[in-house]
């Protein structure tokens, strides 16, 4: 008998979600991490969510994950990004007190049944009969299991760079996972190197706050999770500084001392979170870049004396960092407590993975997070939840939970990764999704909680809350569809409608442009609805026609694309395929005709040949 059903290696955002999801399913789960006190640590920026990323947090929460609940407990500055645009692209974001976030994650894990947490560094994997069956720790301990989820973050043969000084580490002061990296290379997996970076941390009391523009949060903070009843922490106001022409001069004169531009780093960095060196070089015409000064914690809490200057991650030497910081408004006398640095690490080409996040060539081994080429807490957490759940389901003999691009941003991300791979760290944006109107942050629970209940990762408390909330939403939608007004009645309160004798429902009124508060006098019950319910009704009314059209498109695509492709399909045996198309299909190994349509560079002729061949097989 195995010691555990599932072993999760790594206690970062992916590992915590993986372990919790596996345990919620009922699998005997071990979370193995090199330091217990760093479980749930925010290694880089002290924030959760954002544009696209906030959708992922809501989706994690809809599947009863941890991140949204922890962010609500730790949040000290909430803001809904893209508020001036449509609800489909609204991006909930919260800055968090680092110490409170870490404590919240650890508390949530401690309350999770079926979960054991042990300290130890994984050194090797046990392979038997072509599948992974356990883990060997560097201290010699062995644990047997049915599946392993590997969430190594930046630790896989990690190297930290400050200028030309290199240190083997996955995070400042923490040793890398060298043996695991060597083990994966020995498996013959397609692998590469990526890099990410972090800015210097500044002493809070050394900043001249008085003359810096304020960046306040929302007056009414909006929680990530519907399970959160109140935001309890004091809310802070951030400030904004900026680089100057002098900052850019110092950076340009010292580019040769940067690890990135000095040739010490081979790995690609994230396009959408560039270092300050990259910004100055790539956008040479700009004389200034904003720097958001974000407190790392509330005063009096651990880290409360530190500030995160968002926007200036760097691998320049410490002396250059100090010189450039001093050229920014409000930071003339700022003290650097910890220098910024870049970290380079191994990743596995995500095309090595099935959509379940299990390795194609090695059953029993699942990968999640930065090891798959992504960047960001939210991307890691979402992958971790799916990998942990699917590992647990596999040990119980169940099929994996797979999400389509029309189901979730998580489905979009997994499809992008496993089908196309990456050439730089992958970050989620709303622009990556074809079905943005359907995949809103505000309806994540309606989209995914039923799937989570069916898959076994939603606990009874969350299921009961969802059932009650859905009944409330359904009742409000039904009443809004049944309540009608004559045109003259609507005109009397200021709505511009034709006097055509046709009665308008509340939904009709909400779908029109204009000031909808005038509706309060005609339907006071609507004004009395909880804000979350009222917004849902307004959004559904506003997008009704578009949503129906998008639903038709999704159903049509599903009917044409649902044909499954055999895992062992021999593409070299398909007549009519060019050698290039055979190579592309063989490398991508699409699991369905829908996935085959999205293989990079595929031609219509190749799709016709593939479809004809598969039909002859069936």
Swiss-Prot record:
Residues binding NAD(+), per UniProt: 269-283
Entry-linked Pfam families: GIDA, GIDA_C_1st, SAM_GIDA_C
InterPro entries: FAD/NAD-bd_sf, GIDA_C_N, MnmG, MnmG-rel, MnmG-rel_CS, MnmG_C, MnmG_C_subdom, MnmG_C_subdom_sf
First-listed, main subcellular location of the protein, grouped into a coarse class: cytoplasm
Subcellular location: Cytoplasm
Membrane-crossing residue ranges in chain numbering: none
Record-level Gene Ontology MF annotations: flavin adenine dinucleotide binding
Record keywords, A-Z: Cytoplasm, FAD, Flavoprotein, NAD, tRNA processing
Binding site for FAD: 10-15
Gene3D superfamilies per the UniProt record, alphabetical: FAD/NAD(P)-binding domain, GidA associated domain, C-terminal subdomain
Annotated Gene Ontology cellular component terms: cytosol
GO biological process: tRNA methylation; tRNA wobble uridine modification
Known cofactor(s): FAD
Complexes and interactors: Homodimer. Heterotetramer of two MnmE and two MnmG subunits.
Family membership noted in the UniProt record: Belongs to the MnmG family.
Physiological role: NAD-binding protein involved in the addition of a carboxymethylaminomethyl (cmnm) group at the wobble position (U34) of certain tRNAs, forming tRNA-cmnm(5)s(2)U34.
Record's protein name: tRNA uridine 5-carboxymethylaminomethyl modification enzyme MnmG
Origin organism lineage: Bacteria, Pseudomonadati, Pseudomonadota, Alphaproteobacteria, Acetobacterales
Gene: mnmG
């Amino acid at each position: 008998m195995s010691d555990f059903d599932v072993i999760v290696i790594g206690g970062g955002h992916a590992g915590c979600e993986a372990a919790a999801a596996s345990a919620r399913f009922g699998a005997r789960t071990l979370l193995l991490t090199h330091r217990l006190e760093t479980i749930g640590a925010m290694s880089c920026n002290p924030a959760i969510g954002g544009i696209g990323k906030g959708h992922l947090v809501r989706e994690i929460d809809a599947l009863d994950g941890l991140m949204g609940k922890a962010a609500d407990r730790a949040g000290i500055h909430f803001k809904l990004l893209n508020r001036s645009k449509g609800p489909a692209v609204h991006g909930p974001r919260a800055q968090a007190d680092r110490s409170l976030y870490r404590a919240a994650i650890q508390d949530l894990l401690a309350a999770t049944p079926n979960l054991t947490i042990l300290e130890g560094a994984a050194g090797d994997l046990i392979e038997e009969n072509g599948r992974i069956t356990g883990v060997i720790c560097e201290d010699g301990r062995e644990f047997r299991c049915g599946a392993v989820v590997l969430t190594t973050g930046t630790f896989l043969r990690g190297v930290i760079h400050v200028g030309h000084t290199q240190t083997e580490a996955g995070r400042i002061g923490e040793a890398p996972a060298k043996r695991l990296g060597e083990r994966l290379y020995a498996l013959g997996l397609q692998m590469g190197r990526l890099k990410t970076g972090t800015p210097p941390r500044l002493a809070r009391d050394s900043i001249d706050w008085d003359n810096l523009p304020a960046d306040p949060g929302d007056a009414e903070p909006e929680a990530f999770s519907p399970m959160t009843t109140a935001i309890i922490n004091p809310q802070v106001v951030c400030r904004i500084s900026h680089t100057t022409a002098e900052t850019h001069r110092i950076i340009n004169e010292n580019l040769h001392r940067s690890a990135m531009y000095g040739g010490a780093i081979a790995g690609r960095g994230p396009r959408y979170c560039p270092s300050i060196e990259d910004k100055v070089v790539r956008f040479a015409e700009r004389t200034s870049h904003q720097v958001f000064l974000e407190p790392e914690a509330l005063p009096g809490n651990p880290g409360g004396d530190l500030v995160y200057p968002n926007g200036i991650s760097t691998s320049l030497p410490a002396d250059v960092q100090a010189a450039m910081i001093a050229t920014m408004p409000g930071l003339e006398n700022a003290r650097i407590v910890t220098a910024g640095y870049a970290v380079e690490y191994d990743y596995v080409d995500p095309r090595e993975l099935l959509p379940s996040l299990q390795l194609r060539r090695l059953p029993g081994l699942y990968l999640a997070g930065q090891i798959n080429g992504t960047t960001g807490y939210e991307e890691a957490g979402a992958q971790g939840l799916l990998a942990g759940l699917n590992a647990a389901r596999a040990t119980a003999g169940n099929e994996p939970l797979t999400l389509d691009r029309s189901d979730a941003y998580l489905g979009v991300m997994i499809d992008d990764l496993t089908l196309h791979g990456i050439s730089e760290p992958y970050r989620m944006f709303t622009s990556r999704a074809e079905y943005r109107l359907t995949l809103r942050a505000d309806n994540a629970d309606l989209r995914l909680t039923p799937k989570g209940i069916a898959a076994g990762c939603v606990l009874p408390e969350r299921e009961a809350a969802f059932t009650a909330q859905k009944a409330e939403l359904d009742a409000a939608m039904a009443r809004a569809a049944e309540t009608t007004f004559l045109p003259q009645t609507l005109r009397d309160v200021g709505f511009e409608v034709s006097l055509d004798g046709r009665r308008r429902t509340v939904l009709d009124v909400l779908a029109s442009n204009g000031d909808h508060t005038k509706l309060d006098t005609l339907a006071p019950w609507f004004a009395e609805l909880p804000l979350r319910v009222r917004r849902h009704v307004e959004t559904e009314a506003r997008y009704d026609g578009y949503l129906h059209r998008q639903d038709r498109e999704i159903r049509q695509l599903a009917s044409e694309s649902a044909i499954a492709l055999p895992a062992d399909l021999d593409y070299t045996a398909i007549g009519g395929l060019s050698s290039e198309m055979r190579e592309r299909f063989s490398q991508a190994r699409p699991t369905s005709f829908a996935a085959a349509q999205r293989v990079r560079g595929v031609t219509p002729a190749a799709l016709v040949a593939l479809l004809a061949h598969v039909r002859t097989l069936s």
